[in-house]
Amino acid sequence: MEKIEHTTISTNGINMHVASIGSGPAVLFLHGFPELWYSWRHQLLFLSSMGYRAIAPDLRGFGDTDAPPSPSSYTAHHIVGDLVGLLDQLGIDQVFLVGHDWGAMMAWYFCLFRPDRVKALVNLSVHFLRRHPSIKFVDGFRALLGDDFYFCQFQEPGVAEADFGSVDVATMLKKFLTMRDPRPPMIPKEKGFRALETPDPLPAWLTEEDIDYFAGKFRKTGFTGGFNYYRAFNLTWELTAPWSGSEIKVAAKFIVGDLDLVYHFPGAKEYIHGGGFKKDVPLLEEVVVVDGAAHFINQERPAEISSLIYDFIKKF
């Protein structure tokens, strides 16, 4: 880890913390919630050893990157704008793009808005979400899964913050990062995420040192920046009306664990394997379902995921 360089880049009106290592073709890694650049620590080291320039920022609202206070500052347009500006500042014309969780969602939008800047895409966990012409994203989730669905619970400012603040940050991160129940998370307001089981001991792939790194950053920032991605998602729906029905025109590979909660959302498997995904992403070359892996797959199965990424991008 000591070889990883840390810099701050000014982009799109914010200061962005960026971790990077290596030289060669650039690979841009986008993390999810509740995570940081650190979620890609294994992939950074592996891809750099294979002759790539591996770059992983803390996204807007996370870690050592600025966190604007308003939820309306966290649309896909803001996040993609940050990343295009980052590439411009680094003098990089095109990248291989790798995303997970919210990072995967933003990677889909990056490819939708600026396919000219992407050589190829590897996304983990979160498939492309087709824009319904009349139903906003969060409204659709609420209709399908009800108010207790975690995505809906994160909408009201202050509520999720109080829930996450009711236990120590390290304990909450242990609960969240080790979730293995593949069912969509239903979190009754009176119980909250604090009711989730705390693993003891931690799984082999997540150390106390890892938790300490994540917790040290989230103790400083809180979780509001991350929650704001959920709170801005209906606004993203409004702003992406011009792209309604558009296809992703980038060569892509998709990887998901068979215990990933997103893989078990209503209709997800049918979309991924039944032709809808390939229709929306016509250059989708491969879907890999990893047996026995849950949501935080890049950390749980680092060697396997690193190899799957490398095997795809080396073709370009």
UniProtKB/Swiss-Prot annotation:
Listed pathway(s): Secondary metabolite biosynthesis; terpenoid biosynthesis
SUPFAM superfamilies referenced in this protein's UniProt entry, alphabetically: alpha/beta-Hydrolases
Q: Give the organism the record lists.
A: Siraitia grosvenorii (Monk's fruit)
Q: Which family does it belong to?
A: Belongs to the AB hydrolase superfamily. Epoxide hydrolase family.
- Positions contributing to an epoxide binding: Y150
- Catalytic residues as annotated in Swiss-Prot or TrEMBL: D101, Y230, H295
Q: Which residue ranges traverse the bilayer?
A: none
Q: What is the lineage of its organism?
A: Eukaryota, Viridiplantae, Streptophyta, Embryophyta, Tracheophyta
Q: Which UniProt keywords apply?
A: Hydrolase
Protein's name in the database: Epoxide hydrolase 2
| Entries under Pfam families matching the protein | Abhydrolase_1 (PF00561)
